[in-house]
Amino acid sequence: MKDVFSTVIFIMKEEKRMKKKILSAALLSVLVSSALGIVTAGAVYEMDEVSVTADREGDVAALPGGLVNQTAKLGILGNKSVMDIPYSEMSMTEKTLETFSDPSQPLANVLQNNPSIRSSTSSPMYTDFSMRGINMNGNHMMLNGIPSLFYQFNGPPNHIIERMDITSGPNAGVNGVSMSNNGTNSGATPAPGTINIVTKKAGLTPVLNYTQTFSGRSSFGEFIDVSRRTGANSEWGVRVMGEYMDGDLALRHAEKEEKNIFINLDRKGETSVTNIFAGSFDLRVNKGQRWFTYGGRSDVLPSAPDSNTDYDFDGTTKWMHGWLLTVNHEKELNGNWSWFVNWGVNRRSGNKYNSSSALKFDEKGNFMSSNVSNAQNEIGTNSYFQTGIKGKFHTGAVEHHMSLAVDRSGAKYWNDTNNSVKGNIIGNLYDGTAYTNSFYIPQLRKAKLSWSEINTGITLA
């Protein structure tokens, strides 16, 4: 009985000790928590400076592989994601040009990487191509958003191009007015679509490049590319690009000589962006005209000729020189709206001696053409001005993007074509052409004003 009583007393003492321990632990926890709370509330911490950078909406970035961009310029709407553009859109990068271009050949050889475009000439004398089956040429290209600064004979040199925004589909409503006299087809923005050439600008990394090329039979080219940025925040940039090329092309007896120099000056301020591009060019192509039409039976075709065959008469040549200038400026008015101005002007002159139309042949490859040789002297000027506003606003939860622009384009063209007496062209696809005595080189005459044109428009998009 005594042992049982002792055991009970021991258990009661142990319970008292446990309660004291639990009470002590609880009090200690409260005191520690209070102390920590006081330290946390009273301390001041200074974090290291954190810089956050991001691409502004609409900036251009290449997709994986580097051949096409994920954004493109859509007329007065500016740079947009290709997923937000309601047309078939492709923006080819500088890498695409470096991969697929031949400096001695027209730009159409690169453009045909777009499924909407096919090259429609093998002649270095022309920039012809087709988009969705409609013939186009250098006249239909835009330069930094300015239309009609290139021609059927000369297009933009490959080495000045940063990217090419190709919009397939009827999008004249976002590009403003254009000239109706533009070579193969009228209008710089016809139904098939538009091609906007964006020139190279100075990047943050300085560039000093000298490049040599060899193509064709003996065409040797030299290129320079120099760029720098300066200013307290690298806001000013300058890039100089030049080319000299001379030699024989892949087509036998065809020669090309090209000289040009261009400069791109840009400024990126806190609330405005300005870009100025200017340069001069001089291009001559001797021989190399390739225009053929088939006039034989529809169920028979002649065998393919040797590509070395010469189809030009002696003295065939085409030459053009001139200059151009574009100015683009955009000023941010507030967080939602901005004002923009686009202006461009050019002047070119040149002459040519060539046969005036295509060589027609039958199912045996024999030529069946009558034609004339001609001497043409031409001068042309184009000008363009556009100003407007663009921005965004909300109606409830819906965000709207809108642009309003007024533009005016003008052009003048002086021309004189002196034709020889009409004569027959004999020969065939395999032995070449034989021209009658009437195919002589006529004398060049002074160009006269042929036409002038002014267009004004308002664009809301």
Residue ranges and their predicted role:
Residues 252, 275-311, 350-359, 369, ...:
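Outer-membrane beta-barrel and related beta-rich outer-membrane complex signature
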Residues 119, 128-130, 146-176:
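Short acidic/polar hinge/loop motifs at secondary-structure boundaries
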Residues 43, 160, 204-208, 220, ...:
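Outer-envelope beta-barrel architecture signal
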Residues 2-102, 108-115:
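N-terminal Sec signal peptide and the immediately downstream disordered periplasmic leader
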Residues 325-348, 371-461:
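Face-selective signature of the C-terminal outer-membrane beta-barrel domain
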Residues 89, 97, 109-111, 164-169, ...:
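Non-catalytic regulatory/gating segments with a bias toward low-complexity or hydrophobic composition
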